Structures are given as structure tokens and as C-alpha cells.
Amino acid sequence: MPLAIKINPKDNVVVALHPIAKGTAVPVDGASVTAVEDIPQGHKMAIAPIHAGENVIKYGFPIGHATADAVPGTWMHTHNVKTNLSGEIEYSYHPNVHPLAPVAPETFMGYRRKDGRAATRNEIWIIPTVGCVNDCAKALVRDNQDLVTDSIDGLYTFTHPFGCSQTGHDHAQTRKLLAALARHPNVGAVLVLSLGCENLTHEQFLTELGEYDHDRIKFLTCQDVDDELVAGREILKELAAYAAQFQREPISSSELVVGMKCGGSDGLSGITANPTIGRFSDMLCARGGSTVLTEVPEMFGAEGFLMDRCQNEKVFEKAVHMINGFKEYFISHNEVVYDNPSPGNKQGGITTLEDKSCGCVQKGGSAPIMDVIGYGDAVTTKGLNMLYGPGNDLVSATALTAAGAHMILFSTGRGTPFGAPAPTLKIATNSQLAAKKSTWIDFNAGVVADGEKTLDEAGADLYQLVLDVASGKQTCAEKKGFREISIFKDGVVL
């Protein structure tokens, strides 16, 4: 079992796959480097002299610079490495696009909607347009579980505090996000629940929603009825009868849309779980499916890896606009763009934002980037897509769901229990986490660090698990009933 890994031949550090004690000789490139201090798992060790001001190279890319001279065997982390990042950058397009060889798709057992779209779940959702009716929505879910029969996979609501006391861009984003959730293919039927006096009016929601199936989506305004729980049950009976007509049938994996996200990352994220997701992404895209990469702030410092893979200059310009637009968002709030790695990230071995970003983008595999889409917009292009969204787990996972993701692959080195509205598969970066939190973790990519599987083998295993989940196998979060949303907010609350 290897002690450490040199990710790229250009690197001047290795990453400890397991804790390395001071004095341990670590094999590197046919020789050995002796650790001059303890190196925690997931952390970096210098394998060559690195002078103060010299770049620290990982993934073949500068992830920061040394702030003090370091001899081989030195622990390289926040105490002696700093970021190179600043503000906006002038980007230029240098195409490095390598289309994937097509592969015949497999099938999964999914649902076929009347509009032709594929689905992996057949649920009834109650979507509140305003936080004032959150408890009404929860009561309707609680009191109507008897309607979950036959092929209906569940009755759920997604509460939030917005829909009123918002103006401008925030109000528009809330409206757009909620309408996008109502259109999600995994929803067999939808009850849109309103109060009646909120900023997000019924008419505004209808305008945002556009054309819709009146049997699939129904509305209830609580102020218009004597008892909203009685009226709501009658509507839910109709929606349940509509949703029950859908049955699972064989569907091509080329119709899958899968979101990709990481959270609670550690030093192994970019070595095990994220590249495993990247292998999966390439497999699905080669079969004609779609994957979605988001977390724009966690692309800072590694965006060049992605931009040169844009399929053409139009997509490249959209990517530039997205990256610099998010930097402007930070700067407008007097925030520095590089102040990202969390305490948990740092404890797990991530030192700078470049370090985190280089690991984050591994989820994108090697496929060309076919499109860049905005917050609340749906995926319309096959292949790898980039989505405007923050690094925050709940906000970005909600955005992935709104984009039409049938499920979300979520890598984590620290562990997290949450689930999005779409089935959320947790992928552990290390075997210790997978063993400790077996009720959170769906897939253990730590087998790569343990030497039990190659990345290609782990990616193939993950692909099969995705087909199983698409066919109805529940994720850990689904089994616990963990699912929620969080809406991106920028402005004032009235």
C-alpha cells in the first residue's frame, strides 16, 4: 500500500495517502524522501527544496507559493504556503478539446413523462411560494402519506423563507428557482402552495412557469379557502391519481442528467473521489448522457483547466462571463476571492483555494464542455455542462436539481448527511469515513487510496451504482428522509 502519491510528474510535493511519521522514508520516483516531521493523511510533503517565494506545484499546477524555505520531507500547509490568487483575470481561448469516443448506452428502469422526458423518481412535491405557508405544507405532507401508493415514490415538501420581502434580482431568482423545481422530471405531480398576499404572486409564478400540464401541476392559495388542509387533501388526491399512472420501464442511460458536487473536502478529494466522479462523467457523456459541474468559486485558480476544454469560443466566452461575474459578486461585497478553504478543508489537507479548486475540477473528467448555463436554467445540451452557482452545498445542490439533474454525486472527505430534492449519492474520499459514517456514505472511493481499485475501476463501479439508483435504489439520504432546498440570495430583506 503506497504511503504517498505524486499526482503529476511536474509536482514538487506528494500527498500522504496515510499518516506519515517523522523519519519515515517515503518512496518517490524510484528514490526516497525522509519525512522531517509528521505528515497527516491528505496533507502535502515537499519532495524537493522549495525556496521562499517559489511555487508549490500539485496537479502539475501552482497551488500557491512557499513563505519560507522548505527542505525535502517538510510538511507544506497553511503555515508555510500562501495563495497566488487576486481579482479578475483577462482570459484567452486556447482550445484543448478532445471529444470522447462514443459508447453504446446501457438502460435503467425509469419513468417516461408525457412530454417525453426521462425520470428516476415518481414523487409528489408541495412547493411553497412563500415561507408563511411552510408549516401548512409540512402538515399536508404529514397528513397525506396514505396517498403514497403503487408507483408513487414519496410525498415531500421543500420549505424556504423567501417569496416575500424580496425585491429585484433576489425576487426574480426565487421565482425562477421554484418554477424550475416544479418542472423537474422526477416530480410526477406538483402542488404549488401560496398564501395569497406575498410578493411572489400566483400570476408571476404562472408567467415564470410557462406552458404546463394542468393535470400534473395544481395550485392552492390558502387565503382563498376555509381550511387549506382539507382543500389541499382533495387536490393531492387528484395529483396522486395522476402520478400513479407512471410505471418504471427501460430507458437509455443517454437520457440521464447527473449533477456533480463536493463538500467537506479533504486532501484526498482530488485524488480519489473527485477523479472517480470524473471517470464516471466521461463514461456517461460518451454514452450520450449529460453531467453538470457547478461551484464557481471553487473553480478559481483552476478555471484554465476547464476553459480550454470549451467546445467553441462562444461557450468559452460564457465561461469567462460566469467566472469573472462571480468574482465581481465577491468584490462588490468587499470579499476577497481567495478566502475559501474552510477549517474542515484545511484540517483535511487543503491549503489554498488553488489547491481546493484543482481537486474540485477533477469531477469534470476530460470531456469537452458543451455549454454554460445560468442559475435556475435547465440543461439542454448533451455532454458536460457548467452551471452558475456558489460553493455552498445546499444552494448549489438545489441549483443542480433545478437544472434538471436526476441525481447528484456528492464527494466528501469530512462527511455530511444532507440530501437535495434529487437523489444525492455521498462518495467518501477515504475508507475511514466510509466505515465510520456508513449511514451517510453510498460509495467508498477510498479504495483508490488503499490500492484496492484503480480510478477506472472505481469509476465503472460508480457508474453501475448510478444506474441502480436511477432504477429505484434509495440513497442513504433518501432512506433517512433527508432532503431540502436553499435558494441563492444576494440582496436586502424588506
Q: Which residue stretches match the model-derived regions?
A:
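Metallocofactor- and cofactor-centric catalytic cores in central/energy metabolism, strongly enriched
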Residues: 1-407, 414-494
